[in-house]
């Protein structure tokens, strides 16, 4: 269940009286920087981000915010592909991360060499890749999407008669295919967090909370999605939690989302969806291990380190290639959001 008291402590104005806030605020001014954080980072990072004028958001809104903000330096708290996306969109800006070792299981599941071979074997197909991919994979794609616009884009391409390659998340790919009926070849990747949600355990929890609603991210397995009252991206799940009638909500996504979700609906009871069957040990336990690598001390070190060991750099040619499908994504998102 959500730790409401802990969340409330981060929501209070006391955060601005903390030593960390004063240090980070000063470093942000010195570096002409702003923090952009994902919903899956820890509550203290999300609170510091908002208190210093930064943005906590999903991948799409992170990209938009970083591109439109006047700061010369972006501190991206999330996983590596998010920092790369920020750099692709803002080659003139310095892009820092708390650590460059924060990977993503979806990104790792789609190696460049293997994916290029897969695409070469299907030259007649339009390549659509999830934002959770490396700069090299993005550069190979025709389109890039986040989960918030994936169905809209695939439906659009399907109406144009396009046959599609989708990578890397197989669960999201199957969900999109089911929703649109599009002709899609799906790469076999998964998210370490969402892949662990189990339908039987979810059914057992539903028996304990029979009046609850289930909200699920589409990176979850199909049998979990079949039990959900609402399926959507992180930002869409937060909106659903606000509008849904039930007071008790079971959440099948990374528990980092609870911070902003509890802000949005403080009267709701949020419960973590189970991540394993009885007697089994979970690997992620509804918390991305790489997102947890982001912490306040690393943010301070990244902003302090003048050698910029945690700076994202992308070769110019690769940046130019990856920028094209990213800009298509941003332009398309303006039409559907």
Swiss-Prot record:
Reactions performed catalytically: iminosuccinate + dihydroxyacetone phosphate = quinolinate + phosphate + 2 H2O + H(+)
Residues where iminosuccinate binds: 38, 59, 130-132, 147, 217-219, 234
EC number: 2.5.1.72
Example GO BP: 'de novo' NAD biosynthetic process from L-aspartate
Localization in the cell: Cytoplasm
GO cellular component, one term: cytosol
Keyword terms, alphabetized: 4Fe-4S, Cytoplasm, Iron, Iron-sulfur, Metal-binding, Pyridine nucleotide biosynthesis, Transferase
Xref: Gene3D superfamilies: NadA-like
Pathway(s) per entry: Cofactor biosynthesis; NAD(+) biosynthesis; quinolinate from iminoaspartate: step 1/1
One Gene Ontology term of the molecular function aspect: quinolinate synthetase A activity
Cofactor note: Binds 1 [4Fe-4S] cluster per subunit.
Cofactor(s) required for function per UniProt: [4Fe-4S] cluster
Chief place of localization: cytoplasm
Pfam families on file: NadA
Positions with a binding annotation for [4Fe-4S] cluster: 104, 191, 288
Biological role stated in the UniProt entry: Catalyzes the condensation of iminoaspartate with dihydroxyacetone phosphate to form quinolinate.
NCBIfam families: nadA, PRK09375.1-1, PRK09375.1-2
HAMAP family: NadA_type1
PANTHER family with a match to the protein in the record: QUINOLINATE SYNTHASE, CHLOROPLASTIC, QUINOLINATE SYNTHETASE A
Family: Belongs to the quinolinate synthase family. Type 1 subfamily.
Protein name, per record: Quinolinate synthase
Species annotation: Wigglesworthia glossinidia brevipalpis
């Amino acid at each position: 269940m959500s730790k409401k008291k802990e969340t409330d402590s981060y929501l209070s104005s006391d955060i601005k009286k903390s030593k960390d806030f004063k240090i980070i605020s000063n470093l942000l001014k010195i570096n002409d920087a702003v923090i952009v954080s994902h919903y899956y980072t820890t509550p203290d990072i999300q609170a510091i981000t908002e208190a210093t004028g930064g943005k906590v958001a999903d991948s799409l809104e992170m990209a938009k915010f970083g591109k439109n903000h006047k700061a010369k330096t972006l501190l991206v708290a999330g996983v590596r592909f998010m920092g790369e996306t920020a750099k692709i969109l803002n080659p003139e800006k310095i892009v820092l991360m708390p650590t460059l070792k924060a990977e993503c299981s979806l990104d790792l599941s789609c190696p460049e060499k293997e994916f290029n071979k897969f695409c070469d074997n299907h030259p007649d197909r339009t390549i659509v890749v999830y934002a959770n991919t490396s700069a090299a994979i993005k550069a190979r794609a025709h389109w890039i999407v986040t989960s918030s616009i994936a169905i809209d884009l695939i439906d659009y391409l399907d109406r144009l008669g396009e046959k599609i390659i989708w990578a890397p998340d197989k669960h999201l790919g199957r969900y999109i295919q089911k929703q649109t009926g599009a002709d899609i070849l799906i790469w076999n990747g998964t998210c370490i967090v969402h892949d662990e949600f189990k339908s039987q355990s979810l059914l057992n929890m539903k028996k304990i909370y029979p009046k609850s609603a289930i909200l699920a991210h589409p990176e979850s397995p199909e049998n979990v999605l079949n039990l959900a009252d609402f399926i959507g991206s992180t930002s869409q799940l937060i909106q659903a939690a606000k509008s849904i009638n039930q007071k008790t909500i079971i959440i099948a996504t990374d528990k980092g989302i609870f911070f902003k979700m509890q802000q949005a609906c403080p009267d709701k009871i949020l419960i973590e969806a189970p991540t394993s069957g009885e007697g089994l040990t979970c690997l992620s336990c509804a918390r991305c291990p790489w997102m947890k690598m982001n912490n306040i001390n690393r943010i301070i070190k990244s902003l302090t380190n003048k050698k910029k060991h945690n700076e994202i750099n992308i070769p110019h040619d690769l940046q130019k290639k990856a920028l094209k499908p990213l800009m298509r994504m941003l332009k398309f998102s303006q039409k559907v959001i």
